[in-house]
A protein has these predicted regions:
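RNA-binding basic/glycine-rich loop and surface signature characteristic of RAMP-family CRISPR effectors
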Residues: 1-271
Length: 271
């Protein structure tokens, strides 16, 4: 649940939210995957990977390795040198966080009258698009590729700790924007450790009049043995209008219980 969490370039004195239009004509705002990645890396305190612009482009320094810098282990890199380039695809993949409620062209009128009055100056005017909504996004982690890059492989205990630190960050994620701190802690979460590396539940959270489509989630969960056996569902009570249906249909646990179970499974995977 967030409010006006990612702005684009804007036009004149109008700050525009990042948004997209679906075929039905409804407009939805989104938080870009790059913005989410920035917040995750910052809050994990792994935003210390050295960079340079020796090749006329800012990129990670050629001598950085995944052993020393978890950021490029999790989110990949491209290093360009005179002899060619080295690429590591992201092992932790993010989707955009797309609003579940449509944008209705609300705007906020702004001025700097308080400052201008101090020196008898004219105040400047501006407008910002505003939107408060629940957002849905997907994180996919390839556990087999964590901590492995060419001839480098870190200890399994370190692989486990990196993923656990990532899960802790996601559970309590927040975002600073324009003087606000937006709480991005998950209110509903579904996932698990699967045999197939498939984001089964991506784009499967649908909201109607603040009611979550529990039947759709159940149908995905029951679609194959992988999801039937390995799916965990967590939620925060008091958010959705059809809470009784959610409990009856999905049998969720608390968000805290879900993340605790996920971390236990990660430790077991790397044991």
């Amino acid at each position: 649940d967030a409010s006006s969490a990612n702005y684009g370039e804007g036009i004149g004195n109008i700050s525009q939210l990042k948004k997209m239009t679906r075929s039905g004509g409804e407009v939805y705002t989104y938080i870009s995957r790059q913005a989410i990645r920035y917040n995750i890396v910052q809050q994990m305190q792994i935003d210390n990977t050295p960079v340079d612009n020796a090749q006329k482009v800012v990129q990670f320094s050629p001598n950085t390795t995944i052993k020393d810098y978890p950021e490029i282990d999790l989110f990949g890199y491209m290093k360009t040198t005179k002899g060619g380039q080295s690429i590591r695809s992201a092992v932790v993949r993010l989707s955009n966080a797309i609003s579940l409620e449509p944008y209705k062209s609300d705007t906020d009128f702004l001025n700097n009258m308080g400052l201008a009055k101090r020196s008898g100056l004219e105040n400047a005017l501006a407008q910002s698009e505003i939107h408060k909504s629940l957002y849905s996004y997907t994180i996919t982690i390839d556990l087999d590729k964590i901590g492995i890059d060419d001839d480098i492989e870190i200890e399994n205990s370190e692989k486990s700790e990196r993923i656990i630190k990532l899960l802790d960050t996601i559970q309590f994620l927040w975002r600073d924007i324009r003087g606000r701190r937006e709480n991005l802690n998950p209110l509903f979460a579904v996932g698990g450790i699967y045999e197939r590396k498939n984001p089964y539940f991506e784009d499967r959270l649908k909201l109607t009049k603040n009611g979550l489509n529990a039947g759709l989630i159940k149908s995905v969960k029951e679609s194959c043995e992988d999801t039937q056996s390995n799916t965990l569902i967590g939620y925060v009570p008091g958010i959705f209008s059809n809470e009784e249906e959610i409990i009856k249909t999905l049998s969720p646990v608390s968000i805290s219980e879900m993340f605790t179970k996920l971390k236990e499974e990660v430790r077991a995977y790397y044991a």
